[in-house]
């Protein structure tokens, strides 16, 4: 067998395994989310199907498959059908670029589907393409509520994609690479400097807020706001097409969790301070990556259970007036520290720890000025009554 063919078959096999793992995780994440929401809301949650409700995802899958697939009369049939496929396809493709271990650690092969030098840039591009599925689904439904939901999703993606990209720019300047393996090894490899959360906590806060907005989760779930848009872009979808959109949303949550774990918490590398207790524990790549992803997925569920939904005007102001300028400030601060502070640091403080202190100070200033900052995105725009043109009275002349 030619080398190129064997490499292609191995890549396809890894892609299938990643897809199966993600879809299985999606099924049980829905169960875990419903059980956790039940505990938070002082109710049991789903616990009837199978032992302790463990077969509930199977029951949900059977129900979705055998429900009637209703198609709207005015829908563009081809685009209406392709939209959920595009959404789940982009979500699965994006996750394939996250490394689950060092090279050759998966039965002698590399534990990723693809590895690009511009890894973080490619992944951000793929995640932003997922909004095409949402927009096309809303547009092709031939109804006003899905159209409004898809327009909201497009505006939301544009607003927070810029802040997300700028928030990691400082991190990339520190590491000097956009490759995920280089980022992980810079943090926790043999010559690791420490997790980037220690030096870029301000950037992490901005990235986390942008991630919540990118995956359309509470408090940023405006595209499918039930009280305003029935179900948003999902209004005219049912059966397996609706399930595909739900899969895409949860896979995007897993991708965002894996991104935060890889960029700021060492990815597949564990903490080295546990080595004296359990030798080799920091070198369990898959275990540590899954544990970190699970923590952030729990955070998504916790936020959904506790925070209310923002208004649409608040959402846009938060993205353009707060997240984007602060991400730009963080980028300029990192550039200034790297340009003007010597590598050995100042006053006996290493440059990295000095940058970490500045980043923490920026976050504390933001919290201290929270009341003033909230006014940037919470207060509605007021009309100038003096310049207001009087309207024509109702009922004619």
UniProtKB/Swiss-Prot annotation:
Catalytic function, reaction form: a quinone + NADH + 5 H(+)(in) = a quinol + NAD(+) + 4 H(+)(out)
Enzyme class: translocase
GO molecular function: oxidoreductase activity, acting on NAD(P)H, quinone or similar compound as acceptor; quinone binding
Pfam families on file: NADHdh (PF00146)
Assigned GO CC terms: plasma membrane
InterPro entries listed in its UniProt record: NADH_UbQ_OxRdtase_su1/FPO, NADH_UbQ_OxRdtase_su1_CS
Key word Translocase present: yes
Family: Belongs to the complex I subunit 1 family.
Cellular compartments annotated: Cell membrane
Transmembrane region(s): 7-27, 78-98, 120-140, 164-184, 195-215, 247-267, 283-303, 322-342, 353-373
Function in brief: NDH-1 shuttles electrons from NADH, via FMN and iron-sulfur (Fe-S) centers, to quinones in the respiratory chain. The immediate electron acceptor for the enzyme in this species is believed to be ubiquinone. Couples the redox reaction to proton translocation (for every two electrons transferred, four hydrogen ions are translocated across the cytoplasmic membrane), and thus conserves the redox energy in a proton gradient. This subunit may bind ubiquinone.
Stored HAMAP family: NDH1_NuoH
Major subcellular site: membrane
Keywords: Cell membrane, Membrane, NAD, Quinone, Translocase, Transmembrane, Transmembrane helix, Ubiquinone
Subunit structure and binding partners: NDH-1 is composed of 15 different subunits. Subunits NuoA, H, J, K, L, M, N constitute the membrane sector of the complex.
GO biological process: aerobic respiration
Protein name, as recorded: NADH-quinone oxidoreductase subunit H
